[in-house]
Amino acid sequence: MKDLLKLLKPTNQAEEFDGIRIALSSPDMIRSWSYGEVKKPETINYRTFKPERDGLFCARIFGPVKDYECLCGKYKRLKHRGVICEKCGVEVTLTKVRRERMGHIELASPVAHIWFLKSLPSRIGLMLDMTLRDIERVLYFESYVVTEGGLTSLEQGQILTEDEYLDALEEHGDEFDAKMGAEAVLDLLRAVDIDGDVQKLREELPETNSETKRKKISKRLKLLEAFQVSNNKPEWMILKVLPILPPDLRPLVPLDGGRFATSDLNDLYRRVINRNNRLKRLLDLAAPDIIVRNEKRMLQEAVDALLDNGRRGRAITGSNKRPLKSLADMIKGKQGRFRQNLLGKRVDYSGRSVITVGPKLRLHQCGLPKKMALELFKPFIYGKLERRGLATTIKAAKKMVERETAEVWDVLDEVIKEHPVLLNRAPTLHRLGIQAFEPVLIEGKAIQLHPLVCAAYNADFDGDQMAVHLPLTLEAQLEARALMMSTNNVLSPASGDPIIVPSQDVVLGLYYMTKEKINGKGEGMVFKDPNEAEKAYRTGQVELHSRVRVRITDTTIDDDGNRTTKTELRDTTCGRAILSLIMPEGLPFELINQAMGKKPIGRMLNKAYRDLGLKDTVVFADQIMYTGFHYAMVSGASVGINDMVIPEAKKEIVSAAEEEVAEIQEQFESGLVTAGEKYNKVIDIWSTANEKVSKAMMDNLSKEIVKNKDGEDEEQASFNSVFMMADSGARGSPAQIRQLAGMRGLMAKPDGSIIETPIVANFREGLNVLQYFISTHGARKGLADTALKTANSGYLTRRLVDVSQDVVIMEEDCGTYEGLYMKPLIEGGDVVEPLRERVLGRVLCEPVMKPGSEEELLPRNTLLDEKMCDVLEENSIDEVKVRSVITCDTDFGVCAHCYGRDLARGHMVNQGEAVGVIAAQSIGEPGTQLTMRTFHIGGAASRATAENNIQVKNPGTIKLHNAKWVVNSDKAHVITSRSTELTLTDEYGRERERYKVPYGAVLKKGEGDSVDGGETVANWDPHTHPIITEVEGRIKFVDLIDGVTMTRQTDELTGLSSIVVLETGQRTSAGKDMRPMVKLVDGKGNDVNIAGTDIPAQYFLPGNAIINLEDNSEVKIGDTLARIPQEGSKTRDITGGLPRVADLFEARKPKEPAILAEKTGTVSFGKETKGKRRLLITPTDGGDQHEEMIPKWRQLNVFEGEQVTKGEVIADGPEAPHDILRLRGVSAVANYIVNEVQEVYRLQGVKINDKHIETIVRQMLRKALILRAGDTNLLEGEMVEMSEVLAANAKAEADGKKPAIFERQLLGITKASLSTESFISAASFQETTRVLTEAAVGGKKDSLRGLKENVIVGRLIPAGTGYSYHKERMQRRLDELNVDIEPTMTAEQAEQQLADALNAGNSSAGDDSAE
């Protein structure tokens, strides 16, 4: 019995460990792992296939080849367990030990570990403070290094060439030591005094001034401290003993025909052993130095190749000319251990097949072919057959199943009942790519899928395949049913809108049945209820579309569940009455009393979910689908060539356009317009022509004139099939119909420019050869784009998941009072996103007050649902402060209140929800729909003329924000501030429109004036930038000398002369240092001050400024003194689509970014250099002056003497997110990234909730840079996790010490993933070698907090249902630590016990942890 128990023991090793530590292993440690030294390069005997003794597969070292059998066959059987055979020396045990027993090689000469040498920055190099090149020259025997200087002039670590060494030998004899090779480096590493060096460097750091030196010191300090903390010894970076992988992990398999298939590692090990043995022999023979050296170098190279082939020099190749796969290659990359086997595994109990439509299924069902079911449920069937007594043994059951007897099918039916299966379609881009269904057995071999879940899977039935998985355990079945059932996933986790929305045929059917027709059969009939209407339709008394009156009963259910009914006669159509029969009670008839396109159906389902709950919605969705299919069939909608009606007006429009083009061509030939202007005009003409044709076509298609019952003509919505499909949203769009029946329009050349002659034909008329050829380019580009897009989008998703995977809801409420202010998003005259959309499902951070009173509408910590949003709208509230993940205070995760509503469920989010992964999937999944290209501004795109006025759309009141203005002589306001915004508010004070107003704009209306819709409120000259005077007086020119700093120009047409200031480059040497300016003086010639200050009114003039006034002329307030011409800003390519999203999340700095003011203060210009000017800001609060060099070609927005606030734009351009964070703070950068990302998705019509993007931004803001360390143990210039900084500061403040000063850093997602605390997660993401090297040197411990690390070590993840498991485990650990201590002990004893308990915990972790 004991033996049996022992047998079971090794398999059941407890996985109770709390972390995994990675460290350098010492030679002794490697020897302790080993079961013996491998002395020979032989593998197995080619005749007997038995492993050679002392070879790479030796049974004595690694264990027996057959279970419980020694090699020579003396001991067989279980009874000899643990005996070591005296003849062949093999222990009698399981073969399995050959997977875990390691061997070793004693190296004849030490060898450097290539990872610590070559992985940048070189750890050995940093340790010794030598360059990598020098160390390599020593290691590969090209030069000597001094290991012991003695009393000579030679320094330790000095590099000597062969000749220098010989000279030194002559001079000093044996007073010094110099060696080459790894021994030398080993001696140097041994000599490093870590504690002393750390002390020295810490003292040096504050005293060094040069930036580079400080960086170098802090790098070295970090490394030394890592060694100090981790108890690694530097000399362990040099190998003296090489471990050998267990043989079953590098198998050698005999193939038929006497050949062997082998792992590359065996070849690499053989090289090492061969060279090592040869070196041993040479040393024994006392061979000449040069030969020994060469052999040592070869050994070093062999070990390098084994550890990381190709890292240094050329990769060693095998017989077939491909590089051998080394140990490093085994773990990195997509095919490496991490990503291939640990993060993604193949599973059993699965099958795959093609999918087809299951229009008769319920939403929670799927059709499973009998063959597949039989195979998947085999074990269940065997068990059931035995329990029934139909089969006596498993074998008999197996026979029955193979014969497929009748009982087997009966049993299968029972087994399948209520046992959900999982269906998955690749690529699984979001969590709805795997859902659970109840199987229904079907004939045939294809899986049947419910049409409504196709949208979630992004599946269609053109040959897609899906995989079926079977949840086995009870818990798995329970989770599948409660969490993954398709009926539980009605809402999309990305936007919170229903994702189970009918499309295509169903939409067409519903649209058809709810259309109305004038003068249909039975028009004007009256029915007592919808049932009667249906009877009349079925008996042919009434047409489906006829306008009739029906008595309809509406039921409304309020919050408490009370029902109120209302019955009245309604004007409707027969079809709508029939549709109302399947409406669940509680939904108003209004919802369907219209032509039901895709959008109204979506709204209806959304309302059903919010008002009636999940169950009714699911039943309703199914009913809608069945009805839709039926009436789509009845409608007989089909497409014939005659349905594509070409508008009459097309000929005229096209010929008119051709005439215009001919006219422009004439103008071009006579030299009136340039080629560029001609090109733009021609393209303009054709674009408008195309618009006209398509408008004419749609008008023609969408309406038809019919006779009504009085015989008069009346127009109604058309019943044209093509139009119905597009109008209902079932398939197609006006743009596509335009190509079928309008004209194809302008096409692009391969270089992206637009061809001047459009394709005038459409598909109905047919294309000629040239037209066809032109259009092939676009089509091919589309295909190439799609392929690229898929890969790029997948990679973006992977980076997003990796950065956000450990964001999990950890607690209910972190109690923070921080949050983000939310306003409606307004661009120009349009509300892009109303407040309601932005705050729905968020939690309030501050109570909302009723406008104009002290009354509290909604208290703090309210979750805003639909009803609350109605309250906000009724009280016309414009700005709300809500909680956000970005400002959440929870360490290691976020709290439920800061996240708000779980979008996929519609209630407050649960603890343990993996919101990070959901966010990443929601952003990544639509990635394939985004465009790939950057738009080149050319042709039709650059038609937008420069804006020169603001015309409001709605009536309302004007408000100006951060504006300064003066009133000029015409009583108009002239703006004299930079970043002014003008908003229009309605009568409730809600913002409706928002515009930017430039400096120098003239406002007809001022602050608080009311305007009518369509009124123009501001004008400015878009081509010049004025300089406005804020005081009146006479002007006086200073340093304006004709021919030195300015020239006069006379306009040919008007004869007026103007003064143009020369740029510094064009001036003579005399004028280089002059500063031309205009001063204002009063009648007596004294300087005038700007009102309310003692700053004299003087305006410096930059180069190219134009002055139309003469010296000493009078000016009034608000007059223009000078104008600076604005050259049209360089046409930049607009980056759009996927690359733009990637740029934002990677926080890339744009080319030529906007320059922002670093401080608040007064601007002045210092001495200029050749290509740059010096901008100085003198702070208002009297701090240090800030200076910045700005290239001259940048157009500046500020003049000398102007006030700027911190973060204000000084030179236009795309803003860099890092600058925004530094100068305007966290919420500004969050807003910027959220809005910019949303803009890209909005263009494609994809709806994503803001909080997903915020979750990613939170992860990008995880790190802080330490500016001053204070009294904490942080290093300045170091990047540290925010939570760590806050903890250190809290500790310092509690002890009354100085806290550290830090600044938040914004990291791109790749960099953020690589700098996570967990090295396992980082290593499995990218740059595996670098991450592992760094972690090993620092002796890092991974405490397995995130999801990825736990998947890799094979545990439940700390999210979802695994969250409670981890919580309980933590609690148990705490209890265990608290239980052992009896209060009777002394303090010392207690401490000892606690230490023992902790050590016991650690040592048990040590056994399992991967050292």
From Swiss-Prot:
Binds 1 Mg(2+) ion per subunit. Binds 2 Zn(2+) ions per subunit. The keyword Zinc applies. GO terms for molecular function: DNA binding; DNA-directed RNA polymerase activity; magnesium ion binding; zinc ion binding. One of its GO terms (cellular component) is DNA-directed RNA polymerase complex. SMART domains: RPOLA_N (SM00663). Zn(2+) 2 binds at residues 814, 888, 895, 898. NCBIfam families: rpoC_TIGR (TIGR02386). This is DNA-directed RNA polymerase subunit beta'.
